[in-house]
């Protein structure tokens, strides 16, 4: 035993004597490496081994004793995998192309994106479809979008494009180029065979004829299968296919065929007469066959035996296979192979309540009005019938209508018979009573009834319901919470109508009245003004104004479910009291959570709440802070100031003065009453809290602290530099306005700048406004300062980054700007401040973004305000976004020169301007008649109008004709682009965890601290009883005691950028009109019609899906799905968020540690945040969303159609007499240029001369886009576009009777790829992406059209029920119909096989 103790003591001495050397621990990951940072810390940081895009980083920690605690020296090493990375001159960029881990002064690893600044050239080889990058030094590139590839290169690299259409962003150096390019044909087949042994030429030929190869293969395989089937009886299943054709042949044979003289069968010039008749009978001689035919014994052509023979024939089956394959491929081949701010809660609540009240009142009022109106109408009808019965009667003797007044019955008639109320005596004339007889009564009653009805509808209900401290001059002895609480607005019992501000401040001085009126006080801003005031007397005075100005708003808090209750209730639900965590059944918890048990919140069965608080000041303070935060929204204004004072001084018993005044007024608001009763209960808890003195700022403190200033004259004009500066505090005598700070410059008064006062960076005795450069003005004080009391205060200068000089900084960007007429070279540093720079030199340290602000970092530079800088121009060396250049050539010569240029790799799109707005496909033409005001010699203000679907890339050709049918000219209407776009703002980045930042501490004995200290955004971990024998700190001999605790944060690699929609969607349609002599385009908003002197456009829209609210972007692709908003850390994509302020995340860390005797433990963190990055990998890529190449984040949604465009094109006046349909034309000159069989086509410019106005048709050996042109002596230049699918030596063009030939100028290059803008239609060999087969179209556009109205609106469970019923019906049909039918079919096929064998004598 003694020997063991001696050995242990010796080991302990050796452990203390030998320092920990590098390599003893922490030498994992890699050996050697370059030391990049050393951090001294008392917080132990866990060792790391992580990788970024240029290196691997590891850390080694050496611990030592510092006083009574441990400290550590942490060394960070970097092993560069990209050796000469510094040659690319990197700079920090939020949207950079590669990630480097930065190490801050606490040892925390922070991922930062960077961009190289070496010049890089980006080009596109259109012949091969490759992106070409050139850089004279090492550089980093990234291609993202529909394809993704990235890496480092030097000198030159070629990256082939992979997809048929590419919308990509190429980043290389400081350039970022966005473009959209499409191959002429699909590349999926080529991409599949790429890398095989086949040469590229063979791959291209094979993929070009892929459909033909597949068709031939299918026919061959099908033919082999059919030959095999001929050996079985299954082949007779084709009888229904062959039989109709054989039957038709038999009918034609019997009726129309010419007969042979020898055998009486159909003539057979190349064969001998047969011995078998068409009815199947067999004879030995031709004469017997002829006799059989002559005697009419032949029953005719037998179709069924011939059909069975065809089923067994290999030739007929092969023909059937070919036909079936063609039909089958026409079916399956492609047709042509796309959180609310709590301050705003009351306003939101009031708005919702108002809208709901309007809806309710409208509904109730409409119902009451309807019932009331119906009642009035029914009453009037009943009154009318009663009056008619009382005043008149229908006589049964004579059939006429008599008045009841004076009517007498005598035997079989009355004294008024043969007379009717509608006229005089009828005598013996025939008259029968009808409704017309009472016309006078009806009209009279209708007028009277209408008047009565109007009177009944007049509303007659009129609802009217109107139902000691001097807070204006409070004394200095009353500035305690007890007295000040009596000045709270609700306690002043002002319940009458509001008082105007002029009456409230009538007793103030004129200057004070002007000042108060200038504040524009109202009920919405007065609470904020009270809270921002610095003197309690001013706050009390304005609380009094509030009580008079806003009595309804002040007492709204005591009305249950009012707008004023929303804020404190929301906070009460958000912050859980500590007592509710342990005793959730308590009435106060249920009251705050669900408004239950609010009448008994003080109930404390078994004294559980008392036991929880008594003797536990920490628990009491925790819940009191929550209560104070809630009450700040119950009594805003002065009450909020007093509650903050209570919280600061910890004089919680002073809360009774506020709670006691609120309780009597809250009897009608049960939830508020219950909450206040609980406040009274918790204040009775038996706890001892040490209070601090009151810290209210009062006028008496200001008055007694400084000496008076006699000279208070305001400065005459603004000044830049303040000499002999003094700080002055001025206030009104009664404290109506809060004290203001001023500065005295040579005894002249100026306003204290809101941005602070600084010492001049070249003369410390002078003062500057806002920064140390004296670039901002000191404004003179107001004239009313002479009426205030002013005190000289101690001169204080602002201490901020503007007052601290630095030799270097982490520069974000360089530039220049105008500062008071002088041009300054400036730098914006990572702290967001601007500095003057005299040299832009790198600091040559391991910090790659650290730059000197002067030569060799010798001089200190001070920041200045950005407001002093105007006309800022940032250097072009900073990141520059580029787009492909578009050149519109006005004449054919320049266009042909561009086509024949040898530059094949430039990202430039060349257009012949007159033909730019034509589609790539020749449109279908229709004829439209000219409309307008017809006059004797023509049409005035002529126009055409029609509609066209608003589909991107759709075009229509129109031949315009006169009313007599004669053609005038052709125009092409082209929907050039349909744009559905919205702006998005950046939220955060997310990605996989590549490492963990961690810090931990150990205590030898005792428990873990509560709460565990940690940085913002870090999560904590701990383990009790961590000290044991052989597992303890230096000098710690505890067993089963102590604590190991710490905090951690994930290091993530940013891969997904999360954006949120920040604007409403905008839908625009651009429509182009092209004629042979002119072309123009107009853009119309979906919501706003376009009316101009040339064209009128409006769009009838259809319902479309809206763009997603939150999207994720990775490598230029847009993903949608369940994504967290900023600040939300639910277990889905975006649970760990990297944004400008740091990293957001949550989780329960999983950790372990390795013990060392007499040494600090090695903490091993296996998990920190709950990173649900795998959920991001399950997001759905939305191919309809693309990122536009704009300066801000703009997303475009591909839409097939937005509706229908109604257009009206104004064409001016036409004179019939001056217009000729057969004009005499001479072609003076013609030039053509372009390419064969390409979307750009062949552009031709013609110079024509004519002496009349007329129209001419255009003919050519190529296909023409415009069919008819209008010629005019005043117009000589015309442009047409041709499509030449085959190469021709010459192009011929005929205009009217004139013809001309020209040799076209053909492009030297043979581009396989075409550049165009993001929203324009790309023309390739496949268009329909929604339905790629005819079967799909049958389902989507045929069957679904029938069943969609029936089942489309049913819920999931109803559809499931219908599917089950249909399945049961199908099962019954299968069991009782299909199976017996198949058995019957099998027997029928076997019977035909036996008959066939008998007919051919095989049995």
UniProtKB/Swiss-Prot annotation:
Provide Cytoplasmic-side residue ranges.
Answer: 231-314, 383-448, 1383-1403
* Alphabetical keyword list: Disulfide bond, Fusion of virus membrane with host endosomal membrane, Fusion of virus membrane with host membrane, Glycoprotein, Host endoplasmic reticulum, Host Golgi apparatus, Host membrane, Host-virus interaction, Membrane, Signal, Transmembrane, Transmembrane helix, Viral attachment to host cell, Viral penetration into host cytoplasm, Virion, Virus entry into host cell
Gene that encodes the chain = GP
Q: Record's InterPro entries?
A: Bunya_G1 (IPR005167), Bunya_G2 (IPR005168), Bunya_nonstruc_pro_NSm (IPR026400)
Residues bearing carbohydrate: 40, 493, 686, 1353
Q: Name one GO biological process term.
A: virion attachment to host cell
Q: Give me the disulphide-bonded residues.
A: 471-487, 523-550, 580-589, 591-598
- Variant or mutagenesis effect after changing residue 580 to S: Loss of disulfide bond
Instruction: Give the UniProt family note.
Output: Belongs to the nairovirus envelope glycoprotein family.
Name this polypeptide is given: Envelopment polyprotein
Q: Transmembrane stretches, by residue range? A: 210-230, 315-335, 362-382, 449-469, 1362-1382
Its GO CC terms are: host cell endoplasmic reticulum membrane; host cell Golgi membrane; membrane; virion membrane
The residue ranges for the Lumenal side of the membrane come to 18-209, 336-361, 470-1361
What is the annotated signal peptide range for this record? 1-17
